[in-house]
């Protein structure tokens, strides 16, 4: 999410601090129109670190999905990993397999949507995203707003 859908300003959990990436609605719509599921997988260690609550992220994600829909595009689902190894809350330090570059969120999406991995693309902006795609054995595309869509 951060760096792809919105500018990565560090631990974004409020819509007031959320800055959309230029042309992102058009990019999402292009994938919708080409029959891809558009699923966001995002590390949100700020929850595990105690910087904000899970409810804050859920509220922001609901707002994001509604805004994207209002622009004629669609997000099928958002998965997030709240994992932080030193979290004071056990559930946030016990699900490391969900945090990218592990593929737990991808495996959940595969199961939930019956996704064919050989027809999937992970679009990201970081080495962690690239490694996640490698680990999941799916194609990776670095986000480049100057390149052609798809």
Predicted segment positions?
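Active-site neighborhood of HAD-like aspartate-dependent phosphohydrolases
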Residues: 1-39
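Active-site flanking residues adjacent to catalytic metal/cofactor-binding acidic residues
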Residues: 1, 42, 124-125
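Short, basic/glycine-rich phosphate-binding loops at helix/coil junctions
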Residues: 2-8, 39, 79-91
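Substrate-recognition element of Asp-dependent hydrolases with the DxDx(T/V) motif
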Residues: 24, 28-64, 73-84
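Asp-based, Mg2+/Mn2+-dependent phosphohydrolase catalytic module
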Residues: 58, 62-76, 86-122, 126-150
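Short glycine-enriched, charge-decorated loop/helix-capping segments at active-site entrances
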Residues: 10-19, 52-55, 92-96
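Anionic group-transfer/hydrolysis microenvironments
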Residues: 2, 44-45, 102
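Short, active-site-adjacent cap segments at secondary-structure transitions
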Residues: 5-6, 46-49, 85-87, 129-130
């Amino acid at each position: 999410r951060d760096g792809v859908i919105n500018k990565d300003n560090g631990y974004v959990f409020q819509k007031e601090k959320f800055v959309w990436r230029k042309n992102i609605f058009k990019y999402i719509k292009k994938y919708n129109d080409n029959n891809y599921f558009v699923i966001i997988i995002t590390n949100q260690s700020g929850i595990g670190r105690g910087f904000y609550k899970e409810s804050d992220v859920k509220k922001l994600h609901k707002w994001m999905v509604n805004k994207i829909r209002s622009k004629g595009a669609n997000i099928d689902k958002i998965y997030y990993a709240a994992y932080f190894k030193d979290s004071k809350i056990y559930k946030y330090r016990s699900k490391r397999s969900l945090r990218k570059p592990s593929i737990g969120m991808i495996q959940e999406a595969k199961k939930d949507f019956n996704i064919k991995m050989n027809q999937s693309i992970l679009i990201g902006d970081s080495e962690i995203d690239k490694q996640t795609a490698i680990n999941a054995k799916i194609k990776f595309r670095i986000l480049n707003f100057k390149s052609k869509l798809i």
